Amino acid sequence: MQEDKYLTVSALTNYIKRKFDADPYLHRVYLVGEISNFRLRTNSHQYFSLKDENAKISAIMFKSAFAKVKFQPEEGMRVIVSGRISLYPGNGSYQIYVDSMQPDGVGALYQAYEQLKIKLSQEGLFEAPKLPIPKYPRKIAIVTSPSGAVIRDIITTVSRRYPIVQLVLFPALVQGNEAANSIAAQIKMINTLDDFDTIIIGRGGGSIEDLWPFNEEVVARAIFASKLPVISSVGHETDTTIADLVADMRAATPTAAAELATPVLTDILEELQKLQLQTIVAFRNILKMRSQQVQHLQQSYIFQEPQRLYEGYVQNVDILTEKLISLEKQQITTAEGSFKTLNSRLLANTPASRIKMAKQNVEHLRQMTNNNITNRFSKYANDLNSLIGSLDTLSPLKIMSRGYTYVTRDTKVVKSIEDLSIDDKIQLNFSDGSANAVIKTINSEDK
């Protein structure tokens, strides 16, 4: 009996995986199914399932492949995918490694267009206030391909309409995977410069794939963030891109964009000529009207007889002067009458007896005051003589007149022999004069 061979789980799984990988029909398969268990992982691989009414298969889409998907996959969306079938040893299940995906029934680009359109509309990018296009620009920036017909059409149109404006080309890719970033970068660059008035972005017609860079979110965000007004001219008139919806103004063609960005110089000159003519006519009319007013004034009675202008005022002054003089006389007469009345009342109310009594009282008071003053002066004189006698008795001169003297040395009074030295010069002061002396001896009396 043959002995059974037991395989490990890994060995069996690897064997089955090799079968999957060796099958040429599984190297490239195309599936239609409904997305299930999808949760968007930012900047990472995507894991989900595809199912129909009867079956379900796990799917993985690596980050590099998912970056090429133009729309946003959603739960329950029916899609068409392509990829290879293989087995994942970790759980022993087979799965499809998806390398491309597009919506079933609707183009992937159209689906992406509608999704981004809804997203930006909800954010308010389409309804935001549009910047006005400068009427008389000095410098216009153009973002387009340097080799396309767009730049030639714009230059031709602007040269014909408004040759004094300066056009500056900012070359950008307008087709391909790098075009959107190229366009957005140039818009941002222009906004760092201070001397531009308007931006024109555009390219010629083409398929939706050709025009797709102008449907990218990065371009829409750059246009919305622009501090300068943006005119979009992408494709033909029937083509409407996301850039057209966000831009401040949309033009059907590059020529139309140039016309929207510039006035016609000849029209401006004609308008200036009209304004000049209107100004001249208006000035002449004003001058004529003022001349007629001057003539009318010259013919008026004020200029013919200027004294009539102030005759009424002179008459009023005379009348007012007479009224003032009359009023002054009246006030003086009234004042004199009032004075006489008051004087009569005063005379009538002053009895002679009261006046006489008052005079006697005043005279009596005067005599009493004189007597008091005389008595006080006599007392003060006696007191003064007594004080003088006392002071005279105590006066040094009075004492010196009785034979006493006082000694000074260097104008200082000598009070003791201790203040003197041999040969000191001293002065003897008498009541009627002085004498000088020199100390020869000093005798001290013992106490």
Curated annotation (Swiss-Prot):
GO cellular component assignments: cytoplasm; exodeoxyribonuclease VII complex
A Pfam cross-reference name: Exonuc_VII_L
Family label: Belongs to the XseA family.
Entry function: Bidirectionally degrades single-stranded DNA into large acid-insoluble oligonucleotides, which are then degraded further into small acid-soluble oligonucleotides.
Quaternary structure annotation from Swiss-Prot or TrEMBL: Heterooligomer composed of large and small subunits.
Molecular functions per Gene Ontology: exodeoxyribonuclease VII activity; nucleic acid binding
Gene expressing this chain: xseA
Naturally occurring in which organism (per UniProt): Pediococcus pentosaceus (strain ATCC 25745 / CCUG 21536 / LMG 10740 / 183-1w)
Compartments in which it is found: Cytoplasm
Organism taxonomic ancestry: Bacteria, Bacillati, Bacillota, Bacilli, Lactobacillales
HAMAP family reported for this sequence: Exonuc_7_L
Keywords annotated in UniProt: Cytoplasm, Exonuclease, Hydrolase, Nuclease
Protein's GO biological process: DNA catabolic process
EC number: 3.1.11.6
Catalytic activities: Exonucleolytic cleavage in either 5'- to 3'- or 3'- to 5'-direction to yield nucleoside 5'-phosphates
Disulfide bond entries: none
Name of this protein: Exodeoxyribonuclease 7 large subunit
